[in-house]
Amino acid sequence: MSRFFSIEVAKDYFNFASAHFLIFPDGQREPLHGHNYQVSVTLEGEIDHAGVVLDFITFKPLVKQVCDALDHRTLIQTESPIIKVNRRGQEIEVRYKTQRLLLPRQDVILLPLVNTSTELLAEHVADQIRREVRKKFPHARIRSMEVGVEEARGQRGMFRGEF
């Protein structure tokens, strides 16, 4: 019989407050606005000799660190074919049709995404967590990860992928 184990972390302090905008399928841009995002993470894998997939005490700070990197920033997608993003010294310029947004560089996180949807933000958070877990816990035997990014109560994007 196969045995499957997982851990889930979903703490109130796994959050980030960020501004963003989406480009809709028809090419329209929604207004710049913000959310107080909440993050949850589930890891599935084999348990180690101590009987754990990964120790909560050492894993939680890693998730918090990933959330903190996005906190109080404007999230800009750099892979959208609809907008143009230019780095100009201490500023980030975003062009959409005839509109121009100019933001201080230190207030922006440029993300290699086509959009800043909760689904793609969940994948980005998962990628960051995966990189850090592999670095800090190289012997962990994790098979898959699921990340949820909630932008409003009961409204969340999910990503699930192999580890």
Regions found by a protein language model. Give the residues of each.
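Charge-rich, low-complexity N-terminal segments
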Residues: M1-F163
